[in-house]
């Protein structure tokens, strides 16, 4: 994000006054140089890992280099914060939780994402948040293959592979894929 200098400035002002982990919630498509600026400021990274196949990334996100960029970014995040650590209260104190949202008709890409994460960083040190709440909005009608919610079969296929790979983390209930759980994104109140 282009706001990193302002984020660092704000964190400098509260350094030593906060007793909570600093969490960086990101879409994952980040420059390594930007992430290096955050070293020492962030305790927990929450990146998305959306696509394995760059053709899919190009089609839906106009990011034909998505896979290379996100892998480099998550690698840098892992270098900075290392393995997930929890306090005596059971809350995460540092580490990475990678989020992945399964898209309709793309379960094989989701499985490839999980296999890549397991291959590069293992399943012991990084947590996974496997999400099922995809709801077709915005321009999804331009892409018939994603203009519906994911099926139970699709999500369960990805969930099964996550379990086979040994991932720990949070596997979302498919029932969360309802409109009432999706923000309006209308910028009201901003």
Where do the PLM segments sit?
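Radical SAM enzyme core and accessory elements
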Residues: 173-190
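C-terminal accessory region of radical SAM enzymes
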Residues: 83-85, 90-94, 153-177
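A hydrophobic, small-residue-rich beta->alpha segment in the mid-to-C-terminal subdomain
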Residues: 144-151
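Short amphipathic alpha-helical segment that frequently serves as the phosphate-/nucleotide-binding helix
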Residues: 111-114, 152, 156
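Conserved AdoMet/S-adenosylmethionine-binding subsite of the radical SAM
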Residues: 1-144
């Amino acid at each position: 994000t282009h706001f990193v200098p302002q984020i660092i400035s704000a964190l400098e002002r509260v350094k030593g006054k906060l007793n909570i982990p600093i969490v960086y919630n990101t879409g994952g498509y980040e420059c390594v140089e930007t992430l290096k600026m955050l070293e020492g400021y962030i305790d927990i990274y929450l990146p998305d890992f959306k696509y394995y196949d760059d053709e899919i990334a190009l089609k839906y996100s106009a990011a034909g280099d998505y896979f290379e960029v996100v892998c480099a970014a998550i690698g840098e995040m892992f270098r900075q914060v290392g393995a997930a650590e929890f306090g005596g209260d059971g809350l995460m104190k540092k580490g990475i939780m990678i989020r992945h949202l399964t898209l309709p008709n793309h379960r094989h890409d989701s499985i490839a994402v999980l296999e890549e994460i397991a291959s590069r960083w293992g399943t012991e040190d990084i947590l996974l948040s496997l999400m099922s709440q995809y709801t077709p909005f915005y321009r999804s009608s331009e892409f018939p293959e994603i203009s519906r919610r994911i099926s139970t079969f699709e999500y369960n296929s990805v969930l099964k592979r996550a379990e086979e790979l040994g991932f720990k983390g949070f596997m979302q209930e498919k029932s969360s894929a309802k409109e009432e759980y999706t923000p309006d994104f209308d910028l009201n109140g901003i």
